Amino acid sequence: FPYQGSSIILESGNVNDYEVVYPRKVTALPKGAVQQKYEDAMQYEFKVNGEPVVLHLEKNKGLFSKDYSEIHYSPDGRRITTHPLVEDHCYYRGHIRNDADSTASISACNGLKGHFKLRGETYLIEPMKISNSEAHAVYKYENVEKEDEAHKMCGVTQNWESYEPIKKASQLIVSTEFQRYMEIVIVVDHSMYTKYKGDSDKIKAWVYEMINTISESYRYLYIDIIVSALEMWSEKDLINVETSAENTLKSFGEWRAKDLIHRISHDNAQLLTATDFDGPTIGLAYVASMCDPKRSVGVVQDHSSVNHLVAITLAHEIAHNLGVHHDEGSCSCGSGYTCIMSPVINSEVIKYFSDCSYIQCREYISKENPPCILNKPLRTDTVSTPVSGNELLEAGKDYD
C-alpha cells in the first residue's frame, strides 16, 4: 500500500496502515431522468495499491418494508411511532468492475463507508475526518488496532442444539421456490441508546449499515432480509436486560410475544444492547425457531467499533433461528476464509456462510417450512415498479 503517515483515528478505531483515495463519481443519468438524492445505480473510480478500480453500486431496494416504522418513547413513557419515507435511502450493494469474484456493501450517506472485496482481499473504506475534503481511507481490517484481543463467542452451546446428519450440497435441489422473505424488527435497548448519546440518526445509520451488510450474506441462502421497524428504548428498557445473555433472551422473547407482535407485522426480532454479557458471549439465539412468537428472537452485544463485526454477529444469531448450527471442522466457505457460523468471532472480516450452513438452512426450510417467511412483502419502491397482481400480497399476516 502506498500509505500516508502512520496512524489515523477513524470511526472504526485507530488504523495503522491506510491508503488515501479520492473517489470520483462517474455515473451519467439518462436524458430526462429525475435526479434523486441517491440514484438507483452509481459508479465511483479510485485507486487501490496504485491500480484504478471502478466500484459499481446498486441501491438495495428491498432493504425496508412498505410500512416501515420507527418507534421511540417520550419522557412520560408514551410510545411515538413514525413512518419515515425511506425510498430515497443511501444503502448500496455492488462489485468492482472486471473482477467476477468481487462484492461490495456500501452506505453512500456521507461519503462512502463500508467494505468491498477486490482480488480475494477484503478492504474497508470510510471518509476521513477532514472538512471540505473528498478524502477517504481504504484499509484492511487487520490494520485496525484491536480494542481487546479476548475471544468473543456465540453463547449457543451443544445442549441448545440437536445435530443431525447433513446431506451433501449436491443432494439438494435448489429452485426459486426456495426464496424466502424475512421481515425483521431491530430493538435498540437503553444502554445502546445511551452509548450513542441519544443520537437517533447515528443509531439508525449504524443499524441500517449492518442490515445492508447481512442482506448481502443472506442472498446466498436465498433469503431476503427486510427491515419492518426500528424500535429505540429511549427512556428506559422495557425488559430486564441482564449480563446473562440467556435470561435477556428469554425476557426479550416473552416481551415480543406479549407486546411487539401485536403492533408490528414481522417475522423475527433482534435486540441490540451495549450491555457486556457474561464471559466471552456476544450473542445468543434460539435454534430452529423462526415464526415462533417467543423464540424467533436473538440478542446481540454491540461489541465492536467496526460495524461489520457486529453485523456478522447479528447474521450469525438470525441463522440460528433458521436452524443453522455452528460450523465444525470440515465446513468451508472458500479457501482460507472464516465463515459466519464459526463459534468464535476472530479478528478478520467474515462475509460468507459455509456449505454446511447452506445445507442446514435449506433442510430446515424444506422440513419445517416456517410459514411467516413465505410471503413477499411490499417493497418501498412498489409504487413506481410495475408488478404482477399476484405479487401484491398483503403484508400484515404474521400471527393471526
UniProtKB/Swiss-Prot annotation:
It is found in: Secreted. Residues 7-176, 378-400 form a propeptide. Its cofactor is Zn(2+). It comes from the Eukaryota. Ca(2+) 1 binds at E183, D267, C372, N375. One of its GO terms (molecular function) is toxin activity. This is Snake venom metalloproteinase H1.
